[in-house]
Amino acid sequence: MSDILTRVISENGKTFGIACDTTALVNEACRKHDVGPLAAVALGRALTGSILMGALLKGDQYLQLKFEGNGPLGKIITEASPDGWCRGYIANPHAELPLLNGRLDVAGGVGHAGLLSVTKDIGMKQKYQGTSHLVSSEIGEDIAYYLTTSEQVPSAVGLGIQLNPNGTIDAAGGFLIQSLPPADEELIASMEEVIANLPSISSMILDGQSPRQMLDKLFGAIPHKETGNSKLKYQCSCSREKMENALISLGAADLASLLTERGEAEVLCEFCRQNYHFAGKDLQEIIDRLKNIQ
């Protein structure tokens, strides 16, 4: 079954909801990055969160989430677009911590002090950038806090990852609910009560519930309608041309030193782990082009 995202809006237009099943793409990301259990859950939550936030964008826009805490997992970066692609990486994929109350200590892995930085490319000359402090380091609450404080849109975010003992992901998904301005405090309180009594996201997915069914539970008695669906996938936008541009950015002198010392270059994409090889003649061609420009 392919991953999917569903959008709904209340009939009065005051509340917008998104839910997604990201089980396959999170498994793909974990496979590519060869992550341990702690990193699998943290990266899975971050990818799912970026998918949900990416669904708020339009057209060719995209966003990047960067979690920079003081925990052993290090930096986590994820990117997503409104058409359903995402990619990401985690700095220390094999970092581990003792269980906390019988559960993986994701907050400890991310670190209790740090920042969430959001960068959006919305087609303007300058990219939009916003930041907020990590409030729980559980990722979902941090995204909700960012949306509520930095973007001034009251939001609730739920993320769930169910890890199999063999290291694969049994279920992954999440939801994002936003109260559109002007905020309806009574409606928000009603939905918060519903959310507090819901089963976990991962358990609903394991029970075979679709994103639409999850949204129906979230909205409860609030009349709402579906506004669209998107298929989701883990997809990297790297290319040999982009990696060549990375080499070009080093400059002719540094490339000449690299050619002398190693005779070739390997450039690894952090997001998908694909390795791009540049032979000595490739490096020399780049150096010659740079010298002709100068």
From Swiss-Prot:
One of its GO terms (biological process) is protein refolding. It is found in: Cytoplasm. One of its GO terms (molecular function) is protein folding chaperone. Under oxidizing conditions two disulfide bonds are formed involving the reactive cysteines. Under reducing conditions zinc is bound to the reactive cysteines and the protein is inactive. One of its GO terms (cellular component) is cytoplasm. Keywords: Chaperone, Cytoplasm, Disulfide bond, Redox-active center, Zinc. Disulfide bonds join C236-C238, C269-C272. It holds the Pfam family HSP33. HAMAP family: HslO. Belongs to the HSP33 family. Redox regulated molecular chaperone. Protects both thermally unfolding and oxidatively damaged proteins from irreversible aggregation. Plays an important role in the bacterial defense system toward oxidative stress. This is 33 kDa chaperonin.
